[in-house]
Amino acid sequence: MSGPSDFLKEAARLRDMAHRARRMAGQLSLDPDRLRLEEYAQELEAEAADWERRAAAGKTKE
């Protein structure tokens, strides 16, 4: 990863994975499994937000 556009692509990929995890979590009947997938989705969202911050910081430096 080298530039803001790459960072935004990574953020989009992570948000897509988070969306998929949430969709799968909604189909699970066992609470521990569902909760774990929801936690994973939150972790992915946080990582995506970090990539977006990096992209914004890179744009202001150019």
Regions from the language model: what does each represent?
Residues M1-E62:
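Long, non-catalytic architectural segments outside compact domain cores
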